[in-house]
């Protein structure tokens, strides 16, 4: 009787320890939310296009372009010719393109995203996918139905 009870407690302890280890090995990326470095993928070529650093400031998320993957023949530090106002003519590297996203359940909403290729700003919402390895980024005008979705991949380097 005592041996059976001891075996039961030992089994329960082992089960709990195993569960704790499994949780400990869960991706830290999901725990951090969308903050960190993300590789954007070109819609047409399916090749990496840029690295965006998403950071939190005063409870809101922002994203800044850290790096561009460009052909060696192209300008390696282009400026935003199509942007308006203070951003016109500014270097794209270092530019904040995601602004003011607030946590709303499993996604971050209420912010905006700038497309330096056309200089336009869109409403934006983002959500983690695949255990925090991917980021679904939706830019839209008016309603979320009228927009475009990209999937960014968490940067490894």
Region annotations inferred by a language model:
Residues 25, 40-124:
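Central antiparallel beta-sheet cores of small beta-barrel/beta-sandwich binding domains
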Residues 24, 132-134, 140-157:
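Edge beta-strand at a domain terminus
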Residues 1-3:
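N-terminal secretory signal peptides that target proteins for export/translocation
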Residues 83-89, 136-143:
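Short aromatic-glycine motifs in intrinsically disordered, low-complexity regions
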Residues 30, 43-45, 116, 127-129, ...:
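Short polar/acidic secondary-structure junctions
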Residues 22-36:
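N-terminal helix-cap/turn-to-beta initiation motif at the start of protein domains
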């Amino acid at each position: 009787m005592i041996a059976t009870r001891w075996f039961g407690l030992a089994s329960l302890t082992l089960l709990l320890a195993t569960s704790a280890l499994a949780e400990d090995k869960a991706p830290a990326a999901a725990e951090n939310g969308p903050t960190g470095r993300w590789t954007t993928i070109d819609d047409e070529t399916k090749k990496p296009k840029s690295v965006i650093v998403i950071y939190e400031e005063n409870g809101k998320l922002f994203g800044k372009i850290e790096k561009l993957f460009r052909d060696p023949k192209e300008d390696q530090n282009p400026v935003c010719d199509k942007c308006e106002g203070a951003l016109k003519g500014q270097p794209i590297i270092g530019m904040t393109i995601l602004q003011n996203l607030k946590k709303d359940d499993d996604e971050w909403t209420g912010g905006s995203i700038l497309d330096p290729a056309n200089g336009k700003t869109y409403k934006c919402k983002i959500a983690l996918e695949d255990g925090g390895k991917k980021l679904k980024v939706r830019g839209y005008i008016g309603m979320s139905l009228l927009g475009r979705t990209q999937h960014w991949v968490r940067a490894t380097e």
